[in-house]
Swiss-Prot record:
TM annotation in the entry: none
Protein name: 1-(5-phosphoribosyl)-5-[(5-phosphoribosylamino)methylideneamino] imidazole-4-carboxamide isomerase
Provenance organism: Thermoanaerobacter sp. (strain X514)
Recorded name of the encoding gene: hisA
Gene3D superfamilies: Aldolase class I
Biological classification of the source: Bacteria, Bacillati, Bacillota, Clostridia, Thermoanaerobacterales
Annotated keywords: Amino-acid biosynthesis, Cytoplasm, Histidine biosynthesis, Isomerase
């Protein structure tokens, strides 16, 4: 199972939110590029970067920081947040992003999803952000009536290989992931990267046992609840 540290960028800083609420912002580091280098030095082979400003505004905002991260690191970089058109997808791949994560666009713009899949294949990941079994979009500010499991099935049928599944009610809480919801999503047969609430090496072991392809770890790393090197040794 691949362990993926998360870097959330807001106002050019590395921050964490709780339950996706922009009012809960905590700044952990002033420079996201230094943070990416730090995780790589500790052994990260892949880093999850979210443009929170982009997710909120509906277009990529922190492209320059993402470019700097790519130039500074050899680790694979996956990027989400505000990716709503072909130009942004093409731009991100052209500067060296390994995976692009489509959230709102995967739901509301099927043509864009199909464009990304036909041009970039498995490097296109869909982010399913769920609250009480229903999908939320636009930086989690809007809730839809779409069921997370139905969306996962639909994505698999379209040709999506990997989904990042986040339970919003768990994100940033350090209460452990929503294992039940993850179990259901795994039943669809897509590769699942778990995100939200991961707070211990025990959580990671359980996710691995369940068959998760990867785990995105955020707040637990930044406050020292999980030691990244120790986690890599165990998982």
């Amino acid at each position: 199972m691949v362990l993926i540290p998360a870097i959330d960028i807001m106002e050019e800083k590395c921050v964490r939110l709780t339950k996706g609420d922009f009012n809960t912002k905590e700044v952990y580091y002033e420079n996201p590029v230094d943070v990416a280098k730090m995780w790589e030095e500790l052994g990260a082979k892949r880093i999850h970067v979210v443009d929170l400003d982009g997710a909120k505004q509906g277009h990529l905002v922190n492209g320059n920081i993402i470019e700097q991260i790519i130039k500074s690191c050899k680790a694979e970089i996956e990027v989400g947040g505000g990716i709503r058109n072909r130009e942004t997808i093409d731009y991100l791949f052209s500067v060296g992003v390994k995976y692009v994560i489509l959230g709102s666009a995967a739901i509301y713009d099927k043509d864009l999803l199909l464009y990304s899949l036909s041009n970039y294949g498995e490097r296109t990941i869909v982010g399913i952000d769920s609250k009480n079994g229903e999908v939320a979009v636009s930086g989690w500010l809007e809730k839809t009536k779409i069921k997370d499991m139905e969306l996962a099935k639909k994505m698999k049928e379209i040709g999506v290989k990997t989904i990042i599944f986040t339970d919003i009610s768990k994100d940033g809480t350090l209460n452990g992931p929503n294992f039940k919801a993850l179990e259901n999503i795994l039943k669809t047969g897509v590769q699942v990267i778990a995100s939200g609430g991961i707070s211990s090496i025990e959580d990671l072991k359980k996710l691995k046992e369940m068959g998760a392809y990867g785990a995105i770890i955020g707040k637990a790393l930044y406050i020292g609840k999980i030691n990244f090197k120790s986690a890599l040794e165990v998982i």
